């Protein structure tokens, strides 16, 4: 069986190809995609050949934020899944010749391993989670990014007594702010882009600050009544920004490294010692958190639909990734609509 797939054949090149799928095995399900979302950071670094430790090689099929409908089940998978089930999955089985990659989500149909003995086997991944009835596919496909934010929030044990600063209001940072408020925390967010600041003010934050136009340190001091933040969540991926964020913390505060920090990095750890700071290093996300975020979306408690800035057909993949590489400031949520393919 063949599938349409978005492919990175080499650094900075994007193609739509027909690929031959692996055969359906006992615990596999076949999924016809509705939508998939681009992870701006992860897929940008993959496309430019800058992923760490060679975890992505070329050619590869990117994507790990996919939602679709089950159309076939292997002999054992039929005990858990039924044709017509809508699922959110991390990665599909990789077609021959496209290995060296942990993603493989931008293709339809997709062969997905649903073996419960293998799902969530490493830090909650991989996963196949059923989508709540009535939840739109394009919103459900962003649940994985919200789940990334969940991991950092869970590890930092953020609670209703906390005053939290979130630096960076891309999808992960915006979701982090909303989820912190769901836990009862008060939240100040910061970004340099007016559109993101406005979205944050409307949907995510108690206080939203444009750090190019306002004194961020002063606004944080006002927000925390001079005590400093209980938790700072960094989604900027900038160690230069981290150095500033250390000063935003109260004594014994927590700093969540929620971005990706490619080497080389320089960080003055002595400043963190002087704050008696706790550092939290989340990575990835879990099926449990994806299910939790989709449930919140269904209940109207987590709103990510307003963050979708662009929708593309798979045939427009090169145009979509041109935005990712060259005009990231214009984007937040980028969705591929596979039903039109």
Give short role names for the model-derived ranges.
Residues 239-299, 338-341:
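Glycine-rich phosphate-binding loop and adjacent beta-alpha segment
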């Amino acid at each position: 069986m063949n599938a349409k797939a978005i492919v990175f054949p080499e650094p900075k090149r994007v193609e739509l190809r027909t690929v031959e799928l692996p055969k359906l095995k006992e615990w596999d399900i076949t999924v016809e995609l509705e939508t998939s979302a681009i992870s701006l950071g992860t897929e940008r670094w993959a496309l430019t050949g800058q992923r760490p430790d060679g975890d992505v090689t070329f050619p590869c099929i990117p994507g790990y934020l996919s939602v679709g409908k089950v159309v076939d089940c292997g002999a054992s998978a039929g005990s858990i899944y039924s044709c017509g089930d809508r699922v959110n999955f991390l990665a599909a089985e990789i077609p021959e010749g496209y290995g060296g990659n942990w993603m493989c989500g931008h293709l339809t149909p997709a062969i997905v391993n649903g073996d419960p003995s293998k799902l969530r086997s490493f830090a909650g991944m991989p996963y196949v989670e059923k989508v709540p009835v009535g939840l739109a596919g394009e919103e459900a496909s962003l649940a994985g990014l919200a789940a990334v934010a969940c991991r950092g929030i869970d590890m930092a044990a953020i609670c209703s007594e906390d005053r939290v600063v979130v630096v960076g209001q891309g999808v992960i940072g915006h979701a982090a702010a909303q989820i912190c408020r769901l836990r009862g925390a008060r939240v100040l967010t910061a970004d340099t882009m007016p559109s993101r600041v406005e979205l944050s003010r409307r949907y995510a934050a108690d206080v939203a600050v444009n750090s190019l136009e306002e004194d961020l340190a002063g606004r944080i001091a006002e927000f925390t009544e001079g005590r400093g933040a209980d938790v700072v969540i960094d989604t900027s991926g900038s160690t230069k920004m981290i150095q500033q964020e250390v000063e935003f913390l109260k004594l014994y505060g927590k700093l969540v490294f929620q971005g990706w920090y490619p080497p080389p990095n320089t960080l003055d750890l002595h400043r963190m010692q002087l704050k008696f700071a706790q550092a939290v290093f989340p990575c990835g996300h879990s099926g449990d958190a994806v299910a939790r975020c989709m449930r919140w979306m269904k209940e109207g408690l987590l709103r990510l639909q307003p963050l979708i800035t662009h929708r593309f057909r798979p045939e427009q993949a090169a145009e979509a990734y041109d935005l990712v590489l060259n005009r990231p400031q214009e984007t937040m949520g980028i969705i591929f609509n596979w039903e039109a393919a």
